[in-house]
Amino acid sequence: MAAERYNPRVAEAHWQKVWEENRTFETDNSDSREKYYVLEMFPYPSGRIHMGHVRNYAMGDVVARYKRAKGFNVLHPMGWDAFGMPAENAAMQNKVHPKEWTYQNIATMKRQLKSMGLSLDWSREFATCDVEYYHRQQMLFIDLYEKGLVTRKTSKVNWDPVDNTVLANEQVVDGRGWRSGALVEQRELTQWFFKITDFSEELLAGLDTLDQWPEKVRLMQRNWIGKSEGLQVRFALAAGTAPAGFSEVEVYTTRPDTLFGAAFVAISADHPLAKKLSEGNAALSSFIEECHQQGTSLAALETAEKKGFDTGIKVKHPFDDNWELPVYVANFVLMEYGTGAVFGCPAHDQRDLDFANKYKLKVTPVVLPKGEDAASFSIGETAYTDDGVMINSRFLDGMTPEAAFNEVASRLEKTDLVGRPQAVRKVQFRLRDWGISRQRYWGCPIPMIHCESCGVNPVPRADLPVKLPDDVEFDRPGNPLDRHATWRHVKCPKCGGDARRETDTMDTFVDSSWYYTRFTAPWENEPTDRKAADHWLPVDQYIGGIEHAILHLLYSRFFTRAMKVAGHVGVDEPFKGLFTQGMVVHETYKANGQWVSPADIRIEEIDGKRVATMLDSGAPVEIGSIEKMSKSKKNVVDPDDIIASYGADTARWFVLSDSPPERDVIWTEAGAEGAHRFVQRIWRLVAEAAPALKDVAPKAGTQGEALGVSKAVHKAVKAVGDDIEKLAFNRGVARLYELVNTLSGALQQAADGKADAEMKGALREATEMLVLMTAPMMPHLAEQCLAELGGKVAGKETLVARAPWPVFDPALVVENEIVLPVQINGKKRGDLTIARDADQASIQQAVLELDFVKAALNGGSPKKIIVVPQRIVNVVA
C-alpha cells in the first residue's frame, strides 16, 4: 500500500515539541560520561539568519547528535554576540533603542534556529548584552587589571570617521573600517589596552600544539604575531646635519646582511627626530599630517602609496664613516613597530625598491642568485628576495646571507659607539597590545572611575555591574554616554569626592573572547565555575568562518591564558579542534542593470541553454556569476522560505551534501528539490515496509540476499561514522544515498509481502541502522521513520535523539573475497575474484580457468605462476 506523503511542516513541529518537552538536549554538568563540547561561533543578532548560518549550525548539530549517540555527555549551547555598532546605527536610522532592536532580532533568530531542529541546550542561552553577562565581564576586567594585564596609555589609534570610534588593527581591512568601509585615520588618544604582548611567545609556541586546526589559520596567526630575530643598529648622524640633542638613529632590521646595499634610512612621522625637524618646517608638517590620514595597521601601510620626505639629514654607514645615507620621513614606517626607523635596501625588498625608484636612489644588489654572474647581474622592477651568495659587500663577499647576518652582528656588537655597542641582537614581535576602548554606547561599560585627586581606579566589586543607562539619545554620531546628564557623574571610591565614570565601552571582540567559558556554568555568580570550566574546556570542536582566523581566534587564545593567570580556568588553549566551513553561494541575476532576486525569476532550458526571465513580465534576465549571498546583490535565499517549502531536514541535507564542508556550496533550487525528493524517498520506503517489519526482531542475515543487505548496512555504519569523525559530511551523505539505493529493492519486496523471515530480520536491522545514521543530518525524518517502525531500537522504546549509534559487526565489514590483478609476462591483463583465504594452489588453478589466460597460453602450459599473497598474480608464459 502506498504511504501517505511525508509532511515536514507537521512532523518537524511535532518532534521539536517532543524534544523540548523532554528537555532532550539539556546537559547535566554532573554526568559522569566522557565529555564532548561542540560549539559553533555564536551569531550577531542582525535580524534574520541566512543560509550560511544554516550550514554552520547544521554541521555542528551533526557532530553533537553523533557524539551523543556515541555515548558522550555533549555540551552544545547557543547564545548571541549582541553588542556592537549596527544596533546604534539602527537606533539613529529607525528611532528604536539598541536594546529593543537587539532583543527583537534575537527573538526572530531564535525562532528560526529552533525551526532547524538543532540539538541545542537552550537552558544555557545568554546574550552578551544581558546585564548578567557583562557584569561578569566587568569582574574579569578588574581581575585582569589587578594582575597587570590591563593598561591605559596614549597611542596612535585607527579612527573610523563614519562610526566615530576606534578600531583595532585587525578591524582595519585594506585601510578601511571593517564595518563602515570608511577610510581609516590616525589619531592620538588615551586608550585601555589588554597586554596581549605579554603572551606573544606563548601564543606563537601554542600554535604547534593545535594539530586539529587548519594549517592556513595557524599560519595566519603565526604571521600576525610576527616573531622576527634581527639586529638593532645605531646609525650615527653626520655632523652638521642634525638638530641639537640628536646624535643617532636606531634602526631595527631583520636583514643586516644587506647593509652594504643600503640606500636610505626612513623614520616614522611620529619619530622624535621627525617631530623636532617639523618645528618651523611647514612642508614637513604638512607631510606628517598626510601620514596621519592613513590607518595604523600594516595592511594600511602595504596598500598605501609609498611616500617620503627628504629631511636633508644624513647618517653614517656603520662600516664606513665616509659613506652617508639620506634620512627620509616615510609614510610606511610606524613608531610602534621596532624602533620607528628602518634602513632601505632596494635590491632585496620590493617596498624599498619602489621607494628608491620613486626618489631616484641608488640600487646595489648584494645577494647574487645561484647560477648568475656577478658582473652582469642587476635589479629591474622586481627586488630579489631569495637566497644566494653575498656580493658587493666587502668582507661579506662569498658568504651566505645567514653567515653574513651573523658576521655583521658579531662585528657591530663589538664596535663601540659613544660608550655602547653599535648593535644588539633583538627579538621583535609584530603583535601589539589590544586596544579595547570604543567611543560608543552599545557595549560593555569599562568599570573604571577617574578622580582628579586619586587618579584612575576600578569600580568596587560591590558596586558592579556598571549598567548602561536606557535614557540616551541617538540624534547624532558619537558616544551618547559622553553626553548623558547624570550617568557619568559618580563619587570616587577612595576619597568620596566628585569623579566621573569611564565613558568608553569595550570592543565587542572582548565579549566573544570568553563566552565559551561562560557556557560551562552560565548561572554562576563568578565569571566561571572553576570545576565546570576545567571539566568542559577546551572546546573539543569549534566551527566557524575563516574570516575570524586572526581577530576572534587570537583574542580568545589570549583571553584563556589571561583567565588562567586570574584563576578562572586551568587551560591555555580554548579550542582543541577548529573547522572553518565554506560559504553558501548563489548565482546572481540582473534585469535592466538592476540586481534581481532568484525568487522573482524563472529559469528554463531552451535549446540546451539555461535561460532566465522575470516571473511577472517575462522580460529577459542576465545570469551572472556565482557569488557569496548578499542583500546588495539580492542573491539571498531566506531559510524561512526553504523550511516552509521543503522542511528543515531538506535544507540541512542539501547544505551538507553538495560539496566538501570546507569549500563553498552553491545553492540551487534544483539541488533543494533533489534533496527533498530523497527525503520523500526514504519516508516512502520505510513507511511502506513498516507494516511488515514493525513487529520483527532485528537480526543480521547469514546467507543470500539477506546477508548482502546486512553487509551493505554494516559497511555503511562504519564508513558514515568515520566520515562524521573526519567532518567529511558530504562523503557520509553520499554513502547514505548509495545505501538507500542498495536497500530499496529489498524494502519494496517486504512492502509487497515477498520477504522471508531471514530477510525481514535483516531488513528490520538495516532500516533501524539507516534511520539512526540519517538522524544527525535529518533528525525529524529519522524520528518519524522510527515511530512508523514502532518507536523501538533493538527492541527498546526510545527517541532517535537518545538512541545509541548503531554498532557494526566486523565480520560483516570485512570482505570475504578479494580482487587480484593478473599479469601475463609482467603486463596486467585482467582480474581474479577469489576467496580471501584461498591457498596458493587454488589461486593458480583459478587463474588457469580465466579466458584471457587460456587465450594467452594458446593450449600450452605456463612456465610458472607467481602468487604474491593478497596482492597480485603473474603468469609467465
Swiss-Prot record:
Residues that coordinate or bind ATP: 631
Identify the residue span(s) of motif 'HIGH' region. Answer: 43-53
Reactions listed under catalytic activity: tRNA(Leu) + L-leucine + ATP = L-leucyl-tRNA(Leu) + AMP + diphosphate
Cell location: Cytoplasm
Q: Where is this motif: 'KMSKS' region?
A: 628-632
Main location (coarse class): cytoplasm
Taxonomy, superkingdom: Bacteria
Pfam families tied to this protein: Anticodon_1, tRNA-synt_1, tRNA-synt_1_2, tRNA-synt_1g
What's in the keyword line of the UniProt record? Aminoacyl-tRNA synthetase, ATP-binding, Cytoplasm, Ligase, Nucleotide-binding, Protein biosynthesis
Protein EC: 6.1.1.4
Q: Molecular function terms in GO for this entry?
A: aminoacyl-tRNA deacylase activity; ATP binding; leucine-tRNA ligase activity
Gene Ontology CC: cytosol
Q: What is one process in the GO biological process aspect for this record?
A: leucyl-tRNA aminoacylation
Its family remark reads: Belongs to the class-I aminoacyl-tRNA synthetase family.
Name of the molecule in the record:
Leucine--tRNA ligase
Taxonomic source organism: Brucella abortus biovar 1 (strain 9-941)
Q: Which gene encodes it?
A: leuS
